[in-house]
């Protein structure tokens, strides 16, 4: 059945391709010397994704069907881990390194929170204690608020740096 092979699109946007080429999904090249810009883009996407992740966790708590939640939750888990792979490995600036570590921990938390919620929902019928654990789920919790603050801080720093660069070039 050689004639029936699937051909991959030339512009694949999988995490592996993005990480290997140092490009974002929009095709813009990441500057290795500007980890703050990369972290800002990653945090922006994570802020958008966390609303859907919150809905999946709340759906698991409400005992919505696994057939409905898993197709939504699985790609979220993969994308949160994929965003971690796109993170800069280290930052020279100690302040940026602190933000990088926080963002890495939050992305890991979000991926695991969705995965655990789906796993508990899948196994709930086995034990009453698992049902109590599902009842105790509280969305993404404090890390969701921390991600919002972290993104605001990254955006504010970037705006201040952009204005400083504009002023310096105008002089």
Regions from the PLM with identified roles:
Residues 1, 14-18, 97, 117, ...:
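Intrinsically disordered, low-complexity segments enriched in charged and polar residues
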Residues 1-29:
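Short Lys/Arg-rich cationic patches that frequently serve as NLS/NoLS or arginine-rich RNA/DNA-binding motifs
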Residues 2-7, 68, 81, 170:
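Short, aromatic- and cysteine-enriched interfacial helices/patches
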Residues 6-9, 22-24, 152-171:
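Short, charged, intrinsically disordered terminal tails
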Residues 11, 15, 35-36, 96-99, ...:
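Short amphipathic alpha-helical segments that mediate assembly, nucleic-acid/protein binding
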Residues 31-94, 132-158:
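Alpha-helical segments in soluble extracytoplasmic regions
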Residues 61, 118, 122-129, 155, ...:
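Structured alpha-helical bundle/scaffold domains in large eukaryotic membrane-trafficking regulators
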Residues 79-83, 93-141:
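Long, amphipathic, charge-rich alpha-helical segments that form helical bundles/coiled-coils
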């Amino acid at each position: 059945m050689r004639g029936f092979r699937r051909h991959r699109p030339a512009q694949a946007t999988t995490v592996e391709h993005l990480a290997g080429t140092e490009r974002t999904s929009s095709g813009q090249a990441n500057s290795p010397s500007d980890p703050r810009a990369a972290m800002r883009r990653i945090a922006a996407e994570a802020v958008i994704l966390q609303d859907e992740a919150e809905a999946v966790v709340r759906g698991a708590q409400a005992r919505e069907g696994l057939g409905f939640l898993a197709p939504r939750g699985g790609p979220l888990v993969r994308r949160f881990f994929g965003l971690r792979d796109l993170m800069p490995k280290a930052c020279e600036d100690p302040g940026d390194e602190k933000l990088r570590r926080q963002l890495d921990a939050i992305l890991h938390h979000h991926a695991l929170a969705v995965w655990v919620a789906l796993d508990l929902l899948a196994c709930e019928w086995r034990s009453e204690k698992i049902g109590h654990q599902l009842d105790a789920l509280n969305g993404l919790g404090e890390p969701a608020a921390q991600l919002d603050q972290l993104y605001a801080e990254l955006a504010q720093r970037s705006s201040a740096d952009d204005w400083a660069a504009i002023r310096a070039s105008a002089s």
